[in-house]
Amino acid sequence: MVHEVLQSHLAAIKNGSAPVNYEINSWQDLEQWFQAHLELQKRYKMTRGCPFGTVGNELTENDGLIRQDLGHLFEVVKHKLAMFFVREKAQGRLVKDANEEHLAAFCIATIQGAMLMGKIERDGQTVEIAFREALMHLKRYAVTPKS
């Protein structure tokens, strides 16, 4: 059953019907991506973390298929995020030494950690702070293109 649920979430992420927009085409889209995760958590009064992180936390050594599903799901999300950074770099709006894959992984790790802390504290403030700090960090890689 978990496999089918994860496959459904993966399909929604791929086709754009997920509750969170994973099509990031601007810094504003990235900010909205972070904010959408917080809004989802607030909808449940901060009693839940990321459903994917929750499933991942429950994995055992015998859950190979679920581990594979989650790995694929996170790779798809990471790829979508990385492609935003790739486009920014190609257009001269990201420093040349920025590693797009690392920035995308940082975004995912921030979401997972912040939502876990929000659930533990039952408060969105920590989540908001983490997201704001993450965006400030990421924007340090942004540059104005040379004319």
Feature roles, as predicted:
Residues V5, R43-Y44:
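N-terminal helix-turn-helix DNA-binding core of bacterial DNA-binding proteins
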Residues D29, Y44-L65:
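Amphipathic alpha-helical segments used for helix-helix packing
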Residues M46, D69, M83-V95:
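A surface-exposed regulatory interaction patch that couples sensing to output
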Residues K96, E100-A104:
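Membrane-interface starts of transmembrane alpha-helices
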